[in-house]
């Protein structure tokens, strides 16, 4: 029998996060599923859940992996059963669903968003997959609208720029771009060239080299039409705009982009996305991150999760390099600070929930 109270990291009235031992375990109804958390990962978005983004008492955290404990009466479409090892990304610090977040002993998710962890991956590796592959799928195949996907690859390869190729979203994007039949052109520091190439990049460039954008345009014969910016700063946007070919194209960021940079090239169409949009529900965070409910986004979320299941089952995608730490939720608090202070580079930070 599932306990009624649990430990979780929750928002405070002061706009921070603390460890609580008296939080309610989510009720399971409809097509939702209860999961006992075995591992969680910390993402840059977790560092942004402060101040006005905090709902007092709401559970924090996005990426998790664990074991199915309970299945709702309407959760019958995705072959999810008690005892299954699963992972995904959910929306933590959600004012509309405050009892659900990854940083808790038990969490809940609708059945269709869950990925079964294949036998060759650990809970810790599973916990690193959600945000990286969900967000990049949304960016590449919805926002940028690449004319091909991992199930039906493009027949004519074309170069796709992935800025920040050594980040967790970057290595996920490189894999997906290649599986979709395109040529991933990535940027990163020289020390990470081999890492990014090992994930499938066709060519890798040093973003700090002053000739980098001209070298990319020369290498790609000025044909880049699509750019995914996994770093999403003003300088990274400027870089992508300079690397996109003469005919223009599309640019997608993971944070709000600079309108000033956008005005420098009218032939480039900019956009920015957030992973939780794939749930199709209202995102009631402050502007500019508020979003209305969007059924079309929800439909894409169902589609893309099904694609990821197939890719995982076939062993076609692999997680970013991870650093595994013990200590459970108390240590996750320190992990959030490690990410905020940029003490972790080139690896995804994962915490075991049970020692």
Swiss-Prot record:
Residues involved in NADP(+) binding: 45-48, 166-169, 189-192, 207, 254-255, 344-345
Keyword set includes Protein transport: no
One family name in Pfam for this protein: ADH_zinc_N
Observed effect of gene inactivation: Completely abolishes trichosetin production.
Disulphide bond pairs: none
Residue numbers binding substrate: 131-138, 275-279
Catalytic activity of the protein: L-serine + 7 malonyl-CoA + acetyl-CoA + 2 S-adenosyl-L-methionine + ATP + 8 NADPH + 11 H(+) = (5S)-3-[(2E,6R,8E,10E,12E)-2,6-dimethyltetradeca-2,8,10,12-tetraenoyl]-5-(hydroxymethyl)pyrrolidine-2,4-dione + AMP + 2 S-adenosyl-L-homocysteine + 7 CO2 + diphosphate + 8 NADP(+) + 8 CoA + 6 H2O
CDD domains: enoyl_reductase_like
Nucleotide-binding is among the record's keywords: yes
GO molecular function: nucleotide binding; oxidoreductase activity, acting on NAD(P)H
EC supergroup of this enzyme: oxidoreductase
Induction: Expression is positively regulated by the trichosetin cluster-specific transcription activator TF22.
Pathway given in the UniProt record: Mycotoxin biosynthesis
Keywords in alphabetical order: NADP, Nucleotide-binding, Oxidoreductase
Cited Gene3D superfamilies: Medium-chain alcohol dehydrogenases, catalytic domain, NAD(P)-binding Rossmann-like Domain
EC nos: 1.-.-.-
Subunit architecture: Monomer.
Described purpose of this protein according to its UniProt entry: Hybrid PKS-NRPS synthetase; part of the gene cluster that mediates the biosynthesis of trichosetin, a trans-fused decalin-containing tetramic acid with antimicrobial activity. The PKS module of PKS-NRPS1 together with the enoylreductase (ER) catalyze the formation of the polyketide unit which is then conjugated to L-serine by the condensation domain of the PKS-NRPS1 NRPS module. Activity of the Dieckmann cyclase domain (RED) results in release of the Dieckmann product intermediate.
PANTHER family, A to Z: HYPOTHETICAL OXIDOREDUCTASE (EUROFUNG), TRANS-ENOYL REDUCTASE STHE
Homology family: Belongs to the zinc-containing alcohol dehydrogenase family.
Protein name: Trans-enoyl reductase
Biological classification of the source: Eukaryota, Fungi, Dikarya, Ascomycota, Pezizomycotina
């Amino acid at each position: 029998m599932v306990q009624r109270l649990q430990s979780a990291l929750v928002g405070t009235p002061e706009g921070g996060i603390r460890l609580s031992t008296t939080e309610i375990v989510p009720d399971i109804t409809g097509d939702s599923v209860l999961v006992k958390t075995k591992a969680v990962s910390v993402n840059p978005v977790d560092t942004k859940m402060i101040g006005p983004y905090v709902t007092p008492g709401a559970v924090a955290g996005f990426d998790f992996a664990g074991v199915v404990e309970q299945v709702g009466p309407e959760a019958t479409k995705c072959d999810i059963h008690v005892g299954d090892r699963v992972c995904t990304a959910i929306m933590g610090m959600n004012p509309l669903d405050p009892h659900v977040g990854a940083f808790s002993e038990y969490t809940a998710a609708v059945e269709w968003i869950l990925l079964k962890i294949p036998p060759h991956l650990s809970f810790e590796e599973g916990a690193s997959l959600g945000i990286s592959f969900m967000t990049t799928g949304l960016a590449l195949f919805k926002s940028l609208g690449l004319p091909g996907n991992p199930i039906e690859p493009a027949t004519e390869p074309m170069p796709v720029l992935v800025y920040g190729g050594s980040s967790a979203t970057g290595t996920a994007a490189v894999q997906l771009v290649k599986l979709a039949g395109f040529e991933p052109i990535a940027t990163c520091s020289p020390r990470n060239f081999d890492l990014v190439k090992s994930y499938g990049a066709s060519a890798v460039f040093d973003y700090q080299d002053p000739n980098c954008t001209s070298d990319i345009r020369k290498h790609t014969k000025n044909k880049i039409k699509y750019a995914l910016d996994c770093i999403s700063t003003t300088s990274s946007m400027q870089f992508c705009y300079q690397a996109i070919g003469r005919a223009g194209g599309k640019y997608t960021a993971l944070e709000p982009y600079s309108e000033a940079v956008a005005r420098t090239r009218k032939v480039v169409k900019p956009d920015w996305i957030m992973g939780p949009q794939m749930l199709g529900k209202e995102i009631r965070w402050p502007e500019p991150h508020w979003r209305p409910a969007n059924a079309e986004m929800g439909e894409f979320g169902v589609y893309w999760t099904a694609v990821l299941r197939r890719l995982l089952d076939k062993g076609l995608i692999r997680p970013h390099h991870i650093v595994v730490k013990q200590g459970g939720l108390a240590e996750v608090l320190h992990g959030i600070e490690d990410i905020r202070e940029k003490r972790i580079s080139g690896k995804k930070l994962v915490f075991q929930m049970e020692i």
